[in-house]
Each structure stands twice: as structure tokens, then as C-alpha cells.
């Protein structure tokens, strides 16, 4: 858990810059159904992005300094685990948020949804979230991600929205987030890197098979 929090402390400042730069003028209310749907859709998008890739496609790097699909996928999975541990092991165990704490989280949903997936600004992942060739195939990675995301979706489904909104924690340069917002952040982060996978696949030198 401590390692997850430390990794978050490194990852979030850079992502928050993107969120602030791309935030819409007004936030719209979000409910439990929206959260579950967003988690489910970003899960489907990730699984689709790596489905059926050959070993050559899985390991292809557009350039020496750029990540392969395998490396991006591993980063997504490592991050999913980190966010999940932070939400269930820390955020939801904090004391009930005060009215002042809740007030500070108002309007952050659309900043997360619009800013985090935007890849205009690109940043280096913290060391703990750097890929290390953990998954030999796309199928293996898909199974690992699905298991973790299924658990996070189950948490979103079984935890009342009022409970998700009642627990607030950091670290986040956007300000502390409630558990609902942390879940949105997690899904938006996956969406950001699915776009990165699509960039790799779109490279002219990407293997045909």
C-alpha cells in the first residue's frame, strides 16, 4: 500500500497538469451508473486494443525510446493495481469527509474526464510503474487486466454512491479526491494509454501480422 501511495505521488502531478489545461468550464453531475458504465467501456476499449495481436505486433517498438504495445499494456495494468489498492485500502478507509472536504471536491469530475485522457502533453511514468516485460503475450495481459478491472467494477457496483462520495483523500495536485473521483481517474488513465496503444498500431512500420 505504501508503495502504491508513493507511486501516485509521482504520477499524479504530471497528469494533473493535463487535467487543468483541458478542463471544461462547468462540471455536470455524475452518478453510480455513469461510473460503472465508464469503467466497463474503458475495460472493453483496452481489451479490444490488444485482442489478437501476434508476438511481433505485441513487442513492436516504433522507436527505441518509445514503448511497445506490451509495455503500454503493462503500465496500464500496474497502474490499475495501484489505483485499486489506493481506493480500497486507503481512500475508503478514511474517516467520513467533512462538509469542507466535500466542497473542495466539487466540479472535479469533468476535469478528470476531459484532461487525463488527453495526450497533448506526455510525461514519463514513475519507476514503479515502468514496464519490465512481465507479460509474454497479449492474452496473458488481457487476463490480468480483466481480473483487476472486474474487481474494481464490482467495488463500484456494491459500494453506494453516497459511500464513495463520503471518503476523501490525496495525494493529488488537483486537490483531494473522493473515492468516486479516484475511480474515474483510474479509468481515464487507462483511456489515455489505450490512445497510446492506438498510436503504436497506427505506425507505418507496425507488423502486418
Functional labels for PLM-detected ranges:
Residues 42-49, 79, 83, 119-123, ...:
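Amphipathic, well-ordered alpha-helical segments in soluble domains
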Residues 1-4:
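Positively charged n-region of N-terminal signal peptides that target proteins for export
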Residues 35, 39, 138-145, 183-186:
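Hydrophobic packing residues in well-ordered alpha-helices of helical domains and bundles
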Residues 7-16:
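Bacterial N-terminal signal peptides
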Residues 30-78:
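N-terminal secretory signal peptides
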Residues 19-34, 85-143, 171-177, 204-209:
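Short, helix-capping/interhelical loops that line the mouth of catalytic, cofactor-
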Residues 14, 33-36, 40, 120-123, ...:
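Domain-scale detector for complete catalytic domains at protein termini or as standalone homologs
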Residues 60, 64-108, 150, 157-158, ...:
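Short, contiguous alpha-helical
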Amino acid at each position: 500500500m505504501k508503495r502504491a501511495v508513493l507511486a501516485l505521488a509521482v504520477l499524479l502531478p504530471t497528469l494533473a497538469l493535463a487535467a487543468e489545461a483541458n478542463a471544461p468550464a462547468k462540471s455536470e453531475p455524475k452518478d453510480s451508473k455513469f461510473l460503472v458504465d465508464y469503467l466497463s467501456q474503458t475495460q472493453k476499449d483496452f481489451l479490444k486494443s490488444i485482442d489478437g495481436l501476434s508476438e511481433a505486433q505485441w513487442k513492436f517498438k516504433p522507436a527505441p525510446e518509445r514503448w511497445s504495445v506490451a509495455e503500454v499494456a503493462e503500465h496500464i495494468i500496474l497502474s490499475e493495481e495501484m489505483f485499486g489498492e489506493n481506493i480500497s485500502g486507503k481512500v475508503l478507509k478514511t474517516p467520513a469527509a467533512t462538509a469542507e472536504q466535500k466542497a473542495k471536491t466539487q466540479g472535479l469530475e469533468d476535469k478528470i474526464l476531459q484532461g487525463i485522457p488527453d495526450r497533448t502533453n506526455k510525461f514519463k511514468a514513475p519507476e514503479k510503474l515502468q514496464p519490465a516485460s512481465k507479460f509474454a503475450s497479449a492474452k496473458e495481459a488481457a487476463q490480468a487486466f480483466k481480473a483487476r478491472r472486474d474487481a474494481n467494477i464490482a467495488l463500484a457496483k456494491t459500494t453506494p454512491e453516497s459511500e464513495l462520495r463520503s471518503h476523501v483523500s490525496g495525494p493529488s495536485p488537483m486537490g483531494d479526491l473522493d473515492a468516486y473521483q479516484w475511480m474515474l481517474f483510474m479509468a481515464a488513465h487507462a483511456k489515455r494509454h489505450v490512445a497510446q496503444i492506438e498510436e503504436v498500431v497506427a505506425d507505418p512500420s507496425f507488423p502486418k501480422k
